[in-house]
């Protein structure tokens, strides 16, 4: 059985730590309790759009990837109907950079209109490539409403239709962020060559 320690910060963030001194890396995972089920029926695809926007930089850090790569880290994310999950891997000696980056975008995400336009285009192309430009690609978009008549699972994570992303405004984006992207709506898991006390110290400094 995997051993772990758990604690909750005053701001509501739940933290789980698994100590493994046999490795030289550390993994930091932040799971937000928001997925496509939380979207309005007339504004779908926002959870997935935010998966992209969270890599667009913050008020303090123009590029999320660059400082992480400089310390030997890598990252990725995924969205489904229930959650949005972000994770990074770094050499354990550089875990402080991971805490800094995750806390900064949680608290100070940039709402630069240029970033929104870039990521909007990326998501629209992904929508077209996966669902609209393939033979029978839209079958999943059509089946979901037949299966889930009233439940918000009735639309795909990427959205019900392209127009919802095309028409997303900066105000829509801000509203979605401040409703769901907060410490008390997230769980952070840290694993690798770290100690619980070290994690507590670093996380309380930035959050």
Where are these regions (language model features)?
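Charge-rich, well-structured scaffold segments of protease-associated domains
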Residues: 4, 8, 66-207
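Residues embedded in well-ordered beta-strands
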Residues: 14-16, 29, 85, 187
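Solvent-exposed coil/turn segments that connect beta secondary-structure elements
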Residues: 20-22, 33-35, 58-59, 91-93, ...
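His/Glu-based metal-binding/catalytic segments typifying zinc-dependent metallopeptidases
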Residues: 20, 29-31, 145
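M16/MPP (pitrilysin/insulinase) zinc-metallopeptidase core fold and M16-derived inactive scaffolds
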Residues: 27-89, 155-158
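Short acidic, gly/pro-rich beta-turn/loop elements at beta-sheet edges
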Residues: 25-27, 38-40, 96-98, 198-199
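A cross-taxa feature marking solvent-exposed loop/turn segments within ectodomains of secreted
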Residues: 23-25, 61, 183
